Amino acid sequence: AANSLCRWCVDTVGRLMISGVLSGLLLSCSGENSTSTSPNQTESIAGVDADANGVRDDVDRYIDTTYAGQASADLNKAVRQYAKAVQSSLLDADSHTLSLTHATERFRALECLMARRPDEFHTIFVDIRAQLLNTPSRSEAYLNADDQVKTANILLLPADQWVTACQS
């Protein structure tokens, strides 16, 4: 049973990585023809993070609006943990060492998210990643960060330990 669960974890993470790359490419392609003048669409990779919590303000607002309420407090924290890890990855995409650190942070955040909402995980993951990678330059930075660690071996926690990946 443990081997099949571990295999499921590896398969799921593999699908997520492929999904991330494909989504990033789609976002990059679709952004070129966009006529939107939204501030999010014209900002730098860093965007605005007025409260310096490591998450862009537009993403903070989205998380607070989408995952509001006491019942979603743990989910709100898990999504924000992932958003912070992705934002760090984008900002440090040119550094192999930092990309490896941030990739590990992203995996821990995804494990936390899977622990908090196993049935909704994929939908939430795709949704928040779309918010994070909402410009071609952000999508390119995400792909660059992943390219920095494509040969790395990042160990996954056993499923019964995913909740330990959650930051308070």
Predicted regions and their residues:
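Calcium-binding acidic motifs and repeat modules
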Residues: 2-8, 14, 29-52, 58-168
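Sec-dependent N-terminal signal peptides
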Residues: 19-23
